[in-house]
UniProtKB/Swiss-Prot annotation:
The lineage of its organism: Bacteria, Bacillati, Bacillota, Clostridia, Lachnospirales. Keywords: ATP-binding, Glutamine amidotransferase, GMP biosynthesis, Ligase, Nucleotide-binding, Purine biosynthesis. SUPFAM superfamilies: Adenine nucleotide alpha hydrolases-like, Class I glutamine amidotransferase-like, GMP synthetase C-terminal dimerisation domain. PANTHER family: GMP SYNTHASE [GLUTAMINE-HYDROLYZING], GMP SYNTHASE-RELATED. The keyword Coiled coil does not apply. It is an enzyme of class 6 (ligase). Gene3D superfamilies: 3.30.300.10, 3.40.50.880, HUPs. This is GMP synthase [glutamine-hydrolyzing]. Residues 5-195 form the Glutamine amidotransferase type-1 domain. One of its GO terms (cellular component) is cytosol. InterPro entries: Class_I_gatase-like, GATASE, GMP_synth_C, GMP_synth_GATase, GMP_synthase, GMPS_ATP_PPase_dom, NAD/GMP_synthase, Rossmann-like_a/b/a_fold. Pathway: Purine metabolism; GMP biosynthesis; GMP from XMP (L-Gln route): step 1/1. It comes from Lachnospira eligens (strain ATCC 27750 / DSM 3376 / VPI C15-48 / C15-B4). The keyword ATP-binding applies. Homodimer.
């Protein structure tokens, strides 16, 4: 992609993808590379700026990730963050040692507003520290431009060479004015114009697809999820009916989801493509009969998808390209294990190439983060209910039904889940209308699951012996940890009443308060 870019060099820190996302929020394109990437390759990319990330090591120890002095002599602005700041000082002649006082968490920091990084930042600001080493002596040519009560060098700069070292993490939200600092570096120091915008990305990607595909045929497995839907939209805009999408409806989707996907991508939809819907519900239910173990269910669902897709692919015949909804985090995670100096091409194919007759993979979203994929979807005109769809597991409702999966159990969980999500969405919308903002309790993910427990109840003066539905709602930033959402009790009461009255086969509703850990977000 021929455009101005900033390169993030990864040293193993936990926030590295976040750094790249923050740079892109400044409308500047950014890519992540391993610290092992050859200097000549970095130079050949002609970056407008370089950012060195944090990492878990001590830069003065043998075997620690490092870089050459020549990196700082390219004539390109360099910003070091945490470990990256320490490494910059260490390589250029400063001194880094174990800190007499470690700093973790929110820390009051005093900055020199004459610095280009802090010109519009408050003189006293809150930043996020996370370090056990510190810069005890700055390198020649540097000037200290920020400090804390326990850290004499919270930031240093060498304006002559446009080198900047920051001991804290401006990329995390806990650093109150971190976005300003990164903006000042990327747009100010580096001089980036800020031309990375989604409308331009969509337009350029469509051109690139047309050039690459030519008159060739493309095959895409369309799940109805965000990534494959946006990939389908991009490809359709570029090559029309040269694209064939195979949508396998395994009967384990949310209520009406299969029809929603077809309404957008099918013959009556807004996209010009060949759409094949395979209704394989009974086939899946038959394979899952009597199976109760979660991993066994996952395996059956995955293997059956392969078989169904294989059958359809054989009917279609040879194609030139197999398209995938690979996104940038997949690419980054495949290439930063230390085995490759450059991020490797990531083929998230899951066994498909063995039986699909194709020449090459095409991944139109491989440069985008998840939030950018959603923006691209909106730019393409894909309906919001698809673009902002909640996370949904690959095995679908198969792992939201505890125990054996049957058609009747699928009906129960589909109906209960639809009611639950509808009522939560309604409550959120009403709050937004009244208050002009989303409620603090608004969950990041919420769904209903069917337990394997039946119990006695009384409905209409008659004894019942029916299933219990569990409601799950969590608040989370990264889905690695999560807390149960505090949905208002009156909303939960309405949900409970509707489920018991409207969903045949249910006489109890539970609300799951378990955090992650010890629990997981999904039930199986």
């Amino acid at each position: 992609m021929d455009q101005e870019k900033v390169i993030v060099i990864d040293f193993g820190g936990q926030y590295n993808q976040l750094v790249a996302r923050r740079v892109r929020e400044c409308n500047v394109y950014c890519e992540i590379y391993s610290y092992k990437t050859d200097l000549a390759q970095i130079k050949a990319m002609n970056p407008k700026g370089i950012i060195l990330t944090g990492g878990p090591n001590s830069c003065y120890e043998d075997g620690a990730p490092t870089c050459t002095k020549e990196l700082f002599e390219l004539g390109v602005p360099v910003l070091g963050l945490c470990y990256g700041a320490q490494l910059m000082q260490h390589v250029l002649g400063g001194k880094v040692e174990k800190a007499p006082v470690r700093e973790y968490g929110k820390t009051e920091t005093f900055v020199d507003k004459s610095s280009a990084l802090f010109s519009d930042v408050s003189e006293k600001t809150i930043v996020w520290m996370s370090h056990f080493d510190y810069i005890s002596q700055i390198a020649p040519g540097f000037k200290i431009v920020a400090h804390t009560a326990d850290c004499p060098v919270a930031a240093a700069e060498c304006t002559e060479k446009n080198l900047y070292a920051i001991q804290f993490h401006p990329e995390v939200l806990h650093t109150q004015e971190g976005t300003k600092m990164l903006h000042n570096f990327v747009r100010g120091v580096c001089g980036c114009a800020g031309t990375w915008k989604m409308d331009a990305f969509v337009e350029n990607t469509i051109k690139e697809i047309r050039e690459k595909v030519g008159s060739g045929k493309v095959l895409l497995a369309l799940s109805g999820g965000v990534d494959s839907s946006v990939a389908a939209g991009l490809l359709s805009r570029a090559i029309g009916k040269q694209l064939t999408c195979v949508f396998v409806d395994h009967g384990l989707l949310r209520k009406d989801e299969g029809d929603e996907v077809e309404s957008v991508f099918g013959p009556e939809g807004q996209f010009d493509l060949n759409f094949i819907r395979v209704n394989a519900q009974e086939r899946y239910y038959s394979k899952l009969a009597g199976v109760t173990e979660p991993e066994a269910k996952r395996k059956i669902i995955g293997e059956e998808f392969i078989r169904v897709f294989e059958e359809e692919a054989k009917k279609i015949g040879a194609v030139d390209f197999l398209a995938q909804g690979t996104i940038y985090p997949d690419v980054v995670e495949s290439g930063l294990g230390g085995e490759s100096a450059v991020i490797k091409s990531h083929h998230n194919v899951g066994g498909l190439p063995d039986f699909v007759d194709f020449k090459e993979i095409i991944e139109p979203l491989r440069n985008l983060f998840k939030d950018e994929v959603r923006k691209a979807g909106l730019e393409l005109g894909i309906p919001e209910h698809l673009v902002f769809r909640q996370p949904f597991p690959g095995p679908g409702l198969g792992i939201r039904i505890i125990g054996e999966v049957t058609a009747d159990k699928v009906r129960i969980v589909q109906d209960a889940d639809f009611i639950y999500r509808s009522e939560v969405d309604k409550a959120v919308a009403e709050y937004k209308k009244a208050n002009g903002k989303a409620p603090a309790w608004m969950p990041n993910q919420y769904f209903a699951a069917l337990t394997n427990m039946r119990s006695v109840g009384v409905m209409g003066d008659e004894r019942t012996y029916d299933y219990a539905v569990a409601l799950r709602a969590v608040n989370t930033i990264d889905f690695m940890t999560a807390e149960s959402a505090e949905i208002p009790f009156e909303v939960l009461q309405t949900v409970m009443s509707r489920i018991i009255n409207e969903v045949r086969g249910v006489n109890r509703v539970f609300y799951d308060l378990t955090s992650k850990p010890p629990g997981t977000i999904e039930f199986e």
